[in-house]
């Protein structure tokens, strides 16, 4: 995956707590959620801005999970939050998307094609709203490899379990 694509992944996120952990293929966030890591081929990218960033070399692609826990963010419309995840793309074309329910919570999905630094890419963004937290999921890949990773991304997002049992302080 190109550096600009990773920049897009990082540019849309707020810094979070660093007390997350991975056990037996499950990522646990101190912000009250957990997700299963995708199947073979994806590796954790350490030191990213998101709580969990994953990358795949062949075919190239990246995905992330992150959460923002504050009343202001949680009060924004899902359409705005979802669009925010793909800011920075040029020549954006919304191919698919709309409201859905994930883990019993309202969510929004958008599949977008566009370009980043002149290179064509595909992106799929999913935002899930909890009571106080907003959970962001993003998958980005070069246009030629985009469809290859979408099944892994779908499985990753659908594994979401929200707990929100933290006591304040999470951002």
Where are these regions (language model features)?
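Conserved polar/disulfide-associated segments of primarily extracytoplasmic proteins
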Residues: 46-136, 141
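Bacterial Sec signal peptide processing site at the extreme N-terminus
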Residues: 16-33
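Surface-exposed amphipathic alpha-helical segments
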Residues: 39-44, 89, 135-171
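Proline-anchored loop/turn motifs at beta-strand termini and strand-loop-strand connectors
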Residues: 30-47
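Sec-dependent bacterial lipoprotein signal peptides
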Residues: 1-15
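Well-ordered beta-strand positions in beta-sheet-rich domains
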Residues: 26, 34-36, 122-124
